[in-house]
Structures are given as structure tokens and as C-alpha cells.
């Protein structure tokens, strides 16, 4: 996986800000990206445009994984980048979905507890 350090943090922050992605939305969004990237018909139909979209989606997932790993594991950006580079695309998706799945489910539980207490 290739990364451009100059744009990684900045570009990811812009995407998150533009789309106002909350944790639950991140999980759903990343899951949709993973599903879309596997659709053979879509790749054939959209051709080069699809490749560009998929490439951008893959870069965003890589950057998100690096950022999350730095935050979660307390390691340097370079160490996190090396770990992510060694992972397959499937492993990266699973890593992100596992994190956001746990985070969104804990938020859901809190919402249920709060709503039942009133």
C-alpha cells in the first residue's frame, strides 16, 4: 500500500469534516466501501472511473487505520504505517469494522439505558 505522508492526516481530516462522520456512520460507511469494492459488475460498468473511486476509498481506509492505530496503541505514525502496510485490504477492513462495531454498539447500549431510565 502506498501512502503520501504530506496529505494523509490533512486529507483524512477533510473527508471526515466534509462528511461529518460519526463513529456509527464511519462503521456503516466503511462497510459499504468494502462491499462496493467487491462488486464485479460495478467495476466492469464504470471502468476507469470505478478504479479511481476504489483507489480513493482504499487510501481513506488505510489512512483511517493508521490514525486509529496511533491513537489506540500509542505508537508512532511511522510504526502504525508499517503495520498497516503489512496488512491485506481484508485485514484492514476487519480491523476498522471491529473497532467501529464495538464503539457504535457501546453507544447504542448507552442510548438504550438512558432512554429506559426516563
From Swiss-Prot:
Tissue-specificity statement: Expressed by the venom gland.
InterPro entries, sorted: Latarcin_precursor
Keywords: Antibiotic, Antimicrobial, Cytolysis, Hemolysis, Secreted, Signal, Toxin
Signal peptide location: 1-3
Pfam families found in the cross-reference section: Latarcin (PF10279)
GO biological-process terms attached to the record: defense response to bacterium; killing of cells of another organism
Domain of life of the native organism: Eukaryota
One GO CC term, this protein: extracellular region
Localization per Swiss-Prot or TrEMBL: Secreted
Gene Ontology molecular function, alphabetical: toxin activity
Chain residues in the propeptide: 4-43
Biological role: Insecticidal, cytolytic and antimicrobial peptide. Forms voltage-dependent, ion-permeable channels in membranes. At high concentration causes cell membrane lysis.
Family: Belongs to the cationic peptide 06 (cytoinsectotoxin) family.
Protein name: M-zodatoxin-Lt8p
Organism in which the protein naturally occurs: Lachesana tarabaevi (Spider)
Taxonomic lineage: Eukaryota, Metazoa, Ecdysozoa, Arthropoda, Chelicerata
